[in-house]
């Protein structure tokens, strides 16, 4: 049926499609009931909705007006569920993961666990080789002075950066995870963190003095300004990321104001590292700053994930046209962590369980 609905804000509609709610309905954002009323002396049987009233973040819809009615795509069919048309009809599962199961702090980890639980085949994501014919070693040098606190440090580089909003599908998945979309580069690092459970950080290459990265502890009494503009007092137990002249980040916690990504950035260094969990937990407490990254690091991450995660980020950068990936990777990994294997006697287990299901191939 047809209903008259008057907008509060000025809006030009020439056969356009809008999200509307009619008398007796409710807004998906806060459940407010929609009632028939009069606006400027004219009866209105409903309302036209903004993206916020539909329960969406306006950052996900850069074409939406600052305030006012959101115009739906022209191919939208009148009468369709607007929430579904905008891709907001989704199911989100929340898991309460105990601290000893850091392997499940990611989508891949949950998928692997579900495959084992329900006896399904787990297929890991396919990460393709990325990068041009250049060599990252011609651009950047990395040195780790404390391999106990940083057992692995991977770095890759991207030039000709093209900052833009990330695609809607990525924004929706991040929003469902409670992460606000920012731009394609930031969103990719957050997306990979949710996917692999591996935190990443991006540095502005042109702001790295000497075009080098040095991982070492701070000096007692050092003061460092983090990305949030706050000054943090350091001591010699706190691991820092440095360039050739200065500190540019608190390892595993937050980067510095002096190397942040700005809109005019052209070249970036992507860090994917493994830091000592206990040290990160104590450092976060000392500087009074706990982040999503530090929360993951302090549980104790698998260093073998670092390389695959940064390669996955570079793959997404190429697929989304966000920049040109420079060939090669810098991987400082002096003592490789081997898989732990537990020997067992399959015949004895079968005998004790009165079963023949296990064999030595397991």
Protein language model features and the residues they cover:
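RNA/tRNA-interacting regions in translation and RNA-turnover enzymes
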Residues: 1, 5-357
